């Protein structure tokens, strides 16, 4: 299961952006017995990166509610991903199951991007601000926004760091009051168990 991973999934890529990948793999019996999770990064000859993750890592990725992880459910390019069908079909519930966690996790990423001060991270911060707002808006969740490519060339129209953080912080009270719907996490865990059994047969 190989999926495009990175700026293309959010829409702030440029023409010469590397195409990075995430490959989701099944563990061996030995890995399961030793409770070993496959999690590594490979540098490809063309300069791109492939992250290799055990399918069991999906649960932690879902629970963390980080858009950097959840982007796999919205990847713009997927290869041999039939086993991820259930997760993609339920991605709306998965993304929004714990809006409090989603808010604080991704707010932290926004802050770290703003602190770096470089233009690329400012675009990331703006993108994640929009994603946080979208998650709380009641709209169907989407990740990719091609207008972010244009924003790179319109520096005068970009929000300041303070404006980005102010917009994110407006949602704090709503985030704190949001209930957790962890039923979808239980279902996701059962789906992974089902896939593991099928794969190991």
Q: Over which residues does each language-model region extend?
A:
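Active-site nucleotide-donor binding segment shared across nucleotidyl transfer reactions
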Residues: 1-35
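Generic structural hydrophobic/aromatic packing signal, biased to beta-strands
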Residues: 2-4, 21, 58, 125, ...
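A structural signal for short, well-ordered beta-strand segments and their strand-loop junctions
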Residues: 4, 71-72, 134-138
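Conserved aromatic-histidine-acidic binding/catalytic patches
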Residues: 14, 46, 116-120
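Residue-level marker of positions within ordered structural domains that often coincide
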Residues: 26, 63, 130
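A basic- and aromatic-enriched beta-loop-alpha substructure that forms the phosphate/nucleotide-
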Residues: 32-113
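Conserved nucleotidyltransferase catalytic core and NTase-mimicking acidic/glycine-rich helix/loop elements
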Residues: 80-201
């Amino acid at each position: 299961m190989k999926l495009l991973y990175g700026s293309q999934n959010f829409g702030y890529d440029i023409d010469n952006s590397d195409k990075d990948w995430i490959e989701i793999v099944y563990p061996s019996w030995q890995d399961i017995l030793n409770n070993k999770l496959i999690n590594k990064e490979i540098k490809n000859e063309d300069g791109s990166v492939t992250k290799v993750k055990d399918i069991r890592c999906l649960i932690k990725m879902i629970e963390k509610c980080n858009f950097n992880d959840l982007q796999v459910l919205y990847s713009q390019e997927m290869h041999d991903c039939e086993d991820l069908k259930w997760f993609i079909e339920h991605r709306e519930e998965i993304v929004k199951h714990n809006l409090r966690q989603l808010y604080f996790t991704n707010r932290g990423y926004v802050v770290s991007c703003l602190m770096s001060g470089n233009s690329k991270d400012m675009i990331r911060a703006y993108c994640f601000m929009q994603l946080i707002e979208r998650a709380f808006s009641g709209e169907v969740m989407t990740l990719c926004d091609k207008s972010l490519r244009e924003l790179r060339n319109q520096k005068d129209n970009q929000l300041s760091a303070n404006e980005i953080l102010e917009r994110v912080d407006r949602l704090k009270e709503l985030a704190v009051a949001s209930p957790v719907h962890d039923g979808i996490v239980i279902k996701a865990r059962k789906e992974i168990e089902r896939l593991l059994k099928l794969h190991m047969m």
